[in-house]
Amino acid sequence: MLAALLINILFIHSVHNAKILLASMPQGRSHTGSFMPLINKMKEQGHEISLYMEAYPDETNFGLKDRMLKIVNHTNPFATEEFESFQWKHDFVVTSQMFPFFYGSTSCDIVLREHRNFFNQMVNEHFDLILTDTLFAVCAYGFTALNKARANHVLMSSTHVESATGAMRAHGINFVLRPRQFMPVQDVEFKPELFHYRVTGTFEWIANFIISGFIVNERMKYSLAPVVPSFSFFEYQRTASSTFTDMPSDLIGPFPRTNDLFEYGAYCPTPKPLTGELLDFVSDPQSKGTILVAFGTVINWGRVPRKKFDAILDTLNSLTDYRIVWAYNGHPLNTKPHIFASSWIPQVDVLFDNRTVLFFSHGGLKSVKEATCSSTPAVFMPMFAEQVRNGWMAKDKGYAEVFSKHILTAENLRKTMKLVLENKSFSKNAARIANLFNDKVVHPLVQGAHYMNRLLRYGGRMPEYF
């Protein structure tokens, strides 16, 4: 009896003090930020969580134990002028997905060539569970596959489960009947009753599987060859114990799934009241409201093509009836007094301020969710990845418009922004969706942490019922 009691005490202690590693893509501030609400909930419950990321050379560790690999004398493979130019000139289609994986492989080449000791340290360190980004974290896949403690790994998706991952994991999702990950900006619609949408969905699903399972796999296999003789991305995904996704089905819609796919993303951030200079700025009694302009961590305003930048600047300068808060990291600006530009803006706090009437953004999932939570109508101008689909989710529910960067002129952008600002249906729909989004029996982060803890109770894997 006493022995059984001691075993139970040790078992509970191990669950509540687990060593967990979160391994994100290189310079992956955005992806890590998507994972952090769940990670912080796990920290609150007593778990020790470390963060691995290849940083060029610096990046925040988000308050986690530091396993950051700071790489000097190299530029971030994801921050090339070529990639930044691509974002403004081209659409991100299914074949574009391979290039970020190639960048992740290039980063891993550097790690294994110049930082092999650090890689080996990660191989040999004991963790109870390893959480790896589903995208671009090539070296993390390598040291997880080699981990001496044989820690089980979980796939962490910062968006909806990619169709290749869903197929490799056999999650039971019919991606032909789901909105396409790389929805074209010239057709921001999803009508599965029409043959055209089912055909294009089928093509994208097959293409994504081929690209991830064969083309990308060969590039990653080449990078990891010095340490993993025959790496298989298919096998790595297949053998994961579960998948966690930040995409709420409240936005993308319900879908069938297996019991090892968990979502935790239908949460809202906690805002703080505006203070100081920013509060004084938005409190102008003559203002019709605040417009927030923020395009995430990837867009460098100093490298935006001149004509497109001028179109945005001219549009913002013309909206003199509003106070405009712009998260801006480019060259010095010549703006009118109604524009407040700063390299850092408390985005959540501005969105939740009751004076904010419009959000102009790129349509990253965090931005779409923050617009949803704060009941803020939006104009989304997608730049890359799945951002067209993210914008579609808000457009489909009636509180946003999706604007194409290919028709970016001051006249076109101003017309779209005025439409959302002056049509009250956008704000009414935003308020309605926010109420539905927050109406949960169990808080999604509490539920997500429960499922993560259940994995730990069973040695990092799903319980076996049969």
Locate predicted features:
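Nucleotide-activated donor-dependent transferases that construct or modify glycoconjugates
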Residues: 14-28
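Short beta->alpha connector loops at strand-helix junctions that form conserved
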Residues: 71-76, 157, 265-266, 362-363, ...
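Nucleotide-sugar-dependent glycosyltransferase catalytic domains
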Residues: 27, 32, 37-322, 333-337, ...
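C-terminal "capping" alpha-helix adjacent to the active site of nucleotide-linked donor transferases
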Residues: 408-425
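A short acidic/histidine/glycine-rich donor-binding loop in glycosyltransferase catalytic cores
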Residues: 339-340, 378, 396-405
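A donor-sugar binding/catalytic signature common to diverse glycosyltransferases
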Residues: 130-132, 343-390
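Cleavable N-terminal signal peptides of Sec/SRP-targeted secreted and luminal proteins
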Residues: 1-17
